[in-house]
Amino acid sequence: HVGGDECNINEHRSLVAIFVFTEFF
């Protein structure tokens, strides 16, 4: 993304949420 660190952080959190979700469910 071309949007800065904040955008990257949001994407990272989304990926982490997906990984956690798939781990427990």
Swiss-Prot record:
Keywords: Hydrolase, Protease, Secreted, Serine protease, Toxin. Residues 1-25 form the Peptidase S1 domain. Cleaves a kininogen analog to release bradykinin. It comes from the Eukaryota. One of its GO terms (biological process) is proteolysis. Monomer. The keyword Hydrolase applies. Inhibited by aprotinin and PMSF, but not by EDTA. Its EC number is 3.4.21.-. It comes from Crotalus atrox (Western diamondback rattlesnake). It is an enzyme of class 3 (hydrolase). Its main location: secreted. This is Kallikrein-like EII. Negative results: does not have plasmin or fibrinolytic activity. One of its GO terms (cellular component) is extracellular region. Expressed by the venom gland.
